Amino acid sequence: MAATKPAARRAVKRAAASAATTPAGSSNGLGAGRDDFDTFRRMAPMSQRRAIAEGFDAVIIERVARELLGVPVQSLLSALSLPSSTILRKIAKHDRLSQGESDRVARVLFVLNLATDLFEDSERAAMWMSRANAELDGLKPVDVLDVQPGYDRVRDILNRAQFGVVA
């Protein structure tokens, strides 16, 4: 585990250095690379915080929607209460997301990681994220991640299921 922390720090530094030297309208923020989801998952919490603060590459929205959740981009934007026209423009221009936008995407990544650990299958985790849940007043887990209390509740549900705690 200790070996992954320096590697994760180097990945964040590379992304930051690359962004500093990347021409305007072109971003190399976290989310554009093939292994970025795994890199982010393995980062230490403060490195994750730094990556969120610097802003993910806007293309991460498309990648999370299509590759991880198997839903249309518009569905994810709506679920996270992100403005479609702004985000689609950022994707087209290869811009970075703001800190707040990146934070909402990171919540999806954090929850998907917990759900994948629980179900031991990323497809089952994605299906769980997209199904109505009685403990969320009939809402889908992905639909409540736009605000902190919703995120906290989804994490609580997954942690209770993982560790066998009864409500």
Report the location of each language-model feature.
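Non-transmembrane "mature" sequence context
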Residues: 1-167
